[in-house]
A protein has these predicted regions:
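Short strand-edge motifs at loop-to-beta-strand transitions and within beta-strands
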Residues: 461-465, 547-551
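Glycan-binding loop/region signatures in secreted carbohydrate-active enzymes
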Residues: 271-363, 395-398
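Glycan-recognition patch characteristic of GH18 chitinases/ENGases
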Residues: 30-141
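Conserved, mostly hydrophobic/aromatic
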Residues: 72, 155, 226, 267, ...
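Beta-strand-rich domain onsets/edges
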Residues: 289-290, 394-430, 494-516, 522
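Short, acidic Ser/Thr/Gly-rich low-complexity loop/linker segments typical of extracellular
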Residues: 450-460, 538-546
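Enriched for extracellular/lumenal, surface-exposed ectodomains of secreted and cell-surface proteins
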Residues: 469-491, 561-579
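Substrate-binding surface in catalytic domains of secreted glycosidases
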Residues: 84-95, 161-309
Length: 586
């Protein structure tokens, strides 16, 4: 190809690209919404910790970073029987739990508290194995969710794995699956979410199964969240090593993806680590802290205060890419006397492992790679700002196009049995229409909230529908969240519905004579207060079960009068007013 032809081709491609970009548009950074991929457990003792005593206030941390949180898992409850759930929050806090719940939900954060298993060995399995007791347990949990207006519940039943005997696992599995199916049905019927938190499982084709009885493939269609506990590979009572190395838990994550929808999966991420004593050289003096003995368990360290380890004299920190964790090595020397008073000294070698900001970023990139729901932090409030900022970088890169919904209604008030027409649009923030997507009508009444499909948007992003209303209703319209788009939601429209009034009154009356005004309201119901009105109240009555009413009154003034019937406003109905009727009072 000649240079002249090559220049012409490049020029043509450039013009074509400019044209196509201006024609179809692209979403700017301002038109995209940060993806809420951060989650975690907030314990009862740290929700409102006493900062004067050095305690953590997890709520402060969540509020400060609220744009990152799609959900919070308050670690507040322990199951003790099929009918009893212990409230740990109530024993730790003077602030009523309705305060943090309302605060979080006002920030658009779903509140899905965790229930742990506080029963003895084998007890929970037996409960789930009994049809009657399992039904009772489902009701106990669903009642807790409803009573506190939670968005769902998270089950962290680790007793199966770490208390019950391995020989019982084959029996536990079908009982667990049956329980999950029944609890999910109850929660979903009330628009509540079911989350489960479990240790790792492995693909059985590899010859390893992990804690297989949690049965991810069997429960995948029933749960809404799966938190994988990707930590405690090494613990305080083991040899030194990484807490939750990526190379260890990623195979479990890949196995989960074979049966569980990616957006349901959250990587359990520790913001803690351990500081082990790995070697003691010499004989330590009597004033050496107990924690410096080789026989002692490792001391826990939190990401928030890890700098104290890094500041140790001679400390060398190394970030391990494979593990996604940082290892800090240092030595401490102690001089003094032994039990006999003789001079002595020792050198204590330490090895500390923890997940720092880089480790959080690495796990967030796994969320991006596999299109997961996010990461779940244990425990909220003990992480530093650098870590969540690393996650935020990925959350921004994974941002969704913002969907903006608008809707108008043909009326704001109507009579019982009449319908209202709605016309609306869904567009991206930059004005591009959201076409061909299902639209749902969200109906909120005093009796509850329902959601039903009404069709799809047209090519220009518009939708129309007409609704027959039987009571006062708040209506909004929505589109589902997708990987690329946010949830679309129109403002709510409140449509008042008034009862239909039919009534009779004589066209001519004599003053001083008593008359009966009769009528009926629709829908028919007893107990509706009905008033005869001529500009002021002149008589009243109450409807019977068939909606009929009777008002007795005696006109006292001569002349042409205007009368109407008025009903009181109710929870489900607006006040009704009939048309005025002219009556000649002689």
């Amino acid at each position: 190809m000649s240079k002249r032809n090559l220049r012409s081709l490049i020029s043509g491609l450039a013009i074509s690209l400019i044209f196509s970009t201006s024609l179809f548009g692209t979403a700017s950074a301002e038109d995209r919404q940060l993806r809420k991929i951060f989650s975690g457990w907030m314990t009862d003792y740290s929700t409102y910790g006493d900062t004067t005593k050095g305690q953590i206030q997890a709520m402060d941390y969540v509020v400060a970073h609220s744009e990152m949180f799609g959900q919070i898992l308050p670690f507040w409850y322990t199951l003790t029987s099929a009918t009893t759930i212990k409230d740990k929050y109530a024993t730790q806090n003077s602030i009523d739990k309705s305060i943090p719940i309302a605060t979080l939900q006002s920030l658009g954060i779903k509140v899905i508290p965790t229930i742990t298993d506080g029963t003895a060995e084998g007890v929970l399995s037996k409960i789930m194995g009994s049809d009657a007791n399992r039904t009772t347990l489902v009701k106990t949990i669903s009642d807790l969710v409803t009573a506190n207006n939670y968005d769902g519940i998270d089950l962290d039943f680790e007793g199966f794995a770490f208390v019950d005997k391995i020989a019982t696992w084959p029996t536990i599995q079908p009982r667990w699956v049956k329980f999950i199916q029944e609890l999910a049905a109850t929660l979903h019927a009330n628009n509540k979410l079911l989350s489960v938190t479990t240790p790792y499982l492995l693909d059985p084709t590899t010859g390893k199964k992990g804690y297989y009885f949690y049965a991810w493939p069997e429960i995948s269609n029933y749960i809404d969240r799966l938190n994988i506990m990707a930590y405690d590979y090494h613990k305080f009572d083991t040899a030194a090593g990484p807490i939750g190395p990526i190379s260890w838990f990623e195979p479990s994550l890949i196995y989960a993806l074979k049966s569980v929808a990616p957006w349901k999966i959250y990587i359990g991420t520790p913001n803690y680590g351990y500081n082990w004593v790995t070697k003691v050289t010499g004989v330590c003096p009597t004033n050496t802290p107990t924690s410096e003995k080789k026989s002692s368990n490792a001391a826990i360290i939190h990401q928030l205060k890890a700098q104290a380890i890094l500041d140790k004299p001679g400390a060398v920190a190394t970030y391990n890419e494979k593990y996604g964790e940082t290892n800090v090595l240092y030595s401490a020397e102690f001089n003094g006397v032994n039990k006999t008073g003789a001079t002595t000294s020792c050198k204590v070698d330490h090895s500390a492992w923890y997940v720092d900001a880089r480790g959080y970023g690495a796990r967030a990139k796994l969320v991006e790679k596999y299109r997961l729901g996010g990461i779940s932090e244990w425990e909220i409030g003990y992480g530093d700002n650098l870590a969540i900022e690393e996650v935020k970088k990925v959350a921004i890169a994974m941002g969704q196009d913002k969907v903006v919904g608008e809707v108008s209604s043909s009326v704001d008030n109507l009579l019982y049995g009449e319908s209202a027409a709605f016309n609306g649009t869904f567009k991206l923030a930059d004005g591009r229409p959201v076409s061909g997507v299902p639209v749902y009508m969200d109906i909120k009444r005093s009796s509850g909230t329902t959601r039903r499909a009404i069709g799809s948007t047209a090519t220009d992003g518009t939708f129309q529908t007409r609704v027959l209303l039987g009571e006062t209703t708040d209506i909004s319209f929505s589109t589902d969240e997708t990987w690329d788009r946010t949830l679309g939601q129109t403002p709510s429209k409140s449509i008042g519905v008034s009862r239909v009034i039919s009534w009779k009154i004589p066209a001519s009356m004599k003053h001083g004579v008593t008359y009966k005004v009769t009528g009926q309201v629709q829908p028919r119901i007893a107990g509706v207060n009905v008033v005869l009105d001529d500009g002021a109240k002149v008589g009243s009555g109450t409807t019977l079960a068939d909606g009929t009413f009777e008002i007795v009154f005696t006109p006292s003034k001569i002349g042409a009068k205007q009368f109407r019937i008025v009903t009181d406003g109710e929870i489900n109905f607006s006040s009704s007013k009939s048309a005025f009727v002219s009556v000649l009072v002689r």
